[in-house]
UniProtKB/Swiss-Prot annotation:
Source species taxonomy: Archaea, Methanobacteriati, Thermoplasmatota, Thermoplasmata, Thermoplasmatales
Domain of life, source organism: Archaea
Family annotation (SUPFAM superfamilies): N-terminal nucleophile aminohydrolases (Ntn hydrolases)
EC annotation from Swiss-Prot or TrEMBL: 3.4.25.1
Name of the molecule in the record: Proteasome subunit beta
Protease among keywords: yes
Species of provenance: Picrophilus torridus (strain ATCC 700027 / DSM 9790 / JCM 10055 / NBRC 100828 / KAW 2/3)
Length: 210
């Protein structure tokens, strides 16, 4: 079984009306790097995304579940599911299986009438904040965020901050590494991924190594 455990770095922040989410791309099995291009950031609706840390199979099942539930909600009601409702749905599901838990740590982020970031644990505990991080690299991420985060920072500054935070974790956490994955929830355009070229360009401008 391929295991991410918490050996990863994920982060989500709000920046004005935007939500920015990012991860590293290293998957580990104990001390072995099993995959250098593991997807950990998923779009789950037009204006919502989710990051994963934990058992790959458990996390992927939950991603598929949330995609299906949010699409069904949108088809039936002609509107997108509110982000707090999505977080509640996911946390309730996890709580119902807490004695046989999904071994995951999740971030759910998105925009409805305002930006949201929720951190959700394996027992279904759900906490909303202006920024959040999961995985073994999270202590290093929080160090950067607490020093440099500003609530109404621009989208450009927010993207750069997420890159800096993940890069800091990669430098100190051996279970985090390789390429970064970043996405933005735009209140007008919806969710989109940043291209690898743009991420590399920003790393160069920030004088950070991949």
């Amino acid at each position: 079984m391929e295991v991410l455990k918490t050996g990863t770095t994920t982060v989500g922040i709000t920046a004005g009306d935007y939500v920015i989410m990012g991860t590293d791309s290293r998957a580990t099995m104990e001390n072995f790097i099993s995959n250098k291009n593991a997807q950990k950031l998923y779009q789950i609706d037009n204006y919502a995304a989710m990051t994963i840390a934990g058992l790959v199979g458990d996390a992927q099942v939950l991603v598929r579940y949330m995609k299906a539930e949010m699409e069904l909600y949108r088809v039936q009601r002609k509107v997108s599911m509110p982000i707090d409702a999505a977080a509640t749905l996911l946390s309730n599901m996890l709580n119902q299986t807490k004695f046989y838990p999904y071994m995951v740590q999740l971030l759910v982020g998105g925009y409805d009438t305002k930006p949201h970031i929720f951190s959700i644990d394996a027992a279904g505990g759900s906490v909303e904040d202006i920024y959040a991080s999961t995985g073994s690299g999270s202590p290093f991420v929080y160090g950067v965020l607490e020093a440099e985060y500003q609530k109404n920072m621009s989208l450009d500054d927010g993207i750069n901050l997420v890159i800096k935070a993940i890069s800091a974790a990669k430098q100190r956490d051996s279970a985090s590494g390789n390429m970064l994955q970043l996405g933005v929830v735009d209140p007008k355009k919806g969710f989109y991924y940043l291209s690898e070229d743009e991420i590399l360009s920003r790393l160069k401008k920030l004088k950070l190594q991949l």
